[in-house]
């Protein structure tokens, strides 16, 4: 019965089910990260946060001069949305994402993405340059690729 239901949905052109990849590929992962960056830089927070799974978490941390990682905090998806809205009300943010590594799981259903982030944060006409390493895990869902969240580790720009 469930099979007939799924076939019926596909016959009706249900885009959510049709969007789920059977195996992740590097080009699909790169495209996803590109869509994230485009939505973020356009300030389209609805589109940006729609690319995350409901249980996604967002962790910020810093790297001390001696190499230690210093945790700043972790937010839920709802908390990250609210924090981003507040921050963007005061500042303009532009990020450049440079993917350094993509590791696709053997089953092809998830991928770990490591990227460098070059960030320009402009507040009251003053620009600050920040750099971070971002690590996120992408998963294949019936709605397409989604991120389980991200960990940004801020450190010196090189």
Can you annotate each of these PLM segments?
Residues 1-4:
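Positively charged n-region of N-terminal signal peptides that target proteins for export
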Residues 52-55, 62, 115-119, 136, ...:
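A mature extracytoplasmic/lumenal domain signature
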Residues 36, 48, 56, 80, ...:
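Hydrophobic pocket/interface hotspot
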Residues 17-51, 74:
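Short, low-complexity N-terminal intrinsically disordered segments enriched in polar/charged residues
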Residues 80, 97-103, 117-119, 133-140:
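Hydrophobic/aromatic beta-strand elements that line small-molecule binding cavities or substrate pockets
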Residues 13-15:
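N-terminal signal peptide c-region/cleavage motif recognized by signal peptidases
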Residues 50, 54-103:
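A solvent-exposed, acidic/Ser-Thr-rich amphipathic alpha-helical stretch
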Residues 110-114, 124, 128-158:
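Short beta-strand edge/turn micro-motifs at domain boundaries
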């Amino acid at each position: 019965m469930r099979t007939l239901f799924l076939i019926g949905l596909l016959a009706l052109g249900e885009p959510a089910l049709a969007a789920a990849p059977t195996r992740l590929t590097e080009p699909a992962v790169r495209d996803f990260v590109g869509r994230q960056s485009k939505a973020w830089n356009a300030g389209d927070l609805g589109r940006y946060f729609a690319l995350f799974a409901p249980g996604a978490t967002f962790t910020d941390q810093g790297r001390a001069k001696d190499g230690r990682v210093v945790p700043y905090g972790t937010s839920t998806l709802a908390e990250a949305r609210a924090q981003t809205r507040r921050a963007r009300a005061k500042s303009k943010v532009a990020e450049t994402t440079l993917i350094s590594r993509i590791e696709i799981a053997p089953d092809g259903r998830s991928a770990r993405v490591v990227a460098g982030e070059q960030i320009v944060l402009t507040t009251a006409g003053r620009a600050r340059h920040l750099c971070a390493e971002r690590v996120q895990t992408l998963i294949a869902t019936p709605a397409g690729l989604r991120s389980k969240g991200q960990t940004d580790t801020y450190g010196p720009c090189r």
